[in-house]
């Protein structure tokens, strides 16, 4: 899961949106560094990551990547799940349009930025102003995201080429998304994540 899915599941679970979004920028034990609700959100994010990585549907999808891109498949798939969520948002969350949800999430997160890790603050400078969460529905933007990550981290250079795997297996990946994401939503709504 990437930014949009973590925020969506946090919302469904009545969990901290800031904590869930911030989790990838917090190393180790967050106890004592943040308020309890943010810590709970950080831990929820971590549980979702472990659960998603171990889903049969996700493991199967990783195998569709070519040997030269399989190492970065988990990262590529996280971004792709956000693409499908953004694209099918109206069907998955009909009572709350995506643009309204994004504004709601931004209002929850921006106030905590002064007490946040610098890299998280930096992310937020672009996430909201460039409307990343809404733009995930555009495959051109997904390619830009993968290229951007590859540019910032040379060891992730294979992300650029993983675009071809997404293009080749697009329909199969979409089917996988529908096989697991609605279940994740139910778990969130039932406070089981």
UniProtKB/Swiss-Prot annotation:
Transmembrane segments: none
Keywords: Fatty acid biosynthesis, Fatty acid metabolism, Hydrolase, Lipid biosynthesis, Lipid metabolism
Enzyme class name: hydrolase
Protein name: Acyl carrier protein phosphodiesterase
One GO term (biological process): fatty acid biosynthetic process
S-S bridge residues: none
Organism: Klebsiella pneumoniae subsp. pneumoniae (strain ATCC 700721 / MGH 78578)
EC nos: 3.1.4.14
Described purpose of this protein according to its UniProt entry: Converts holo-ACP to apo-ACP by hydrolytic cleavage of the phosphopantetheine prosthetic group from ACP.
Gene that encodes the chain: acpH
NCBIfam families on file: PRK10045.1
Pfam families registered for this protein in UniProt: ACP_PD
Reaction catalyzed: holo-[ACP] + H2O = apo-[ACP] + (R)-4'-phosphopantetheine + H(+)
Cited InterPro entries: ACP_PD, ACP_phosphodiesterase_gpbac
UniProt record similarity statement: Belongs to the AcpH family.
GO terms for MF: [acyl-carrier-protein] phosphodiesterase activity
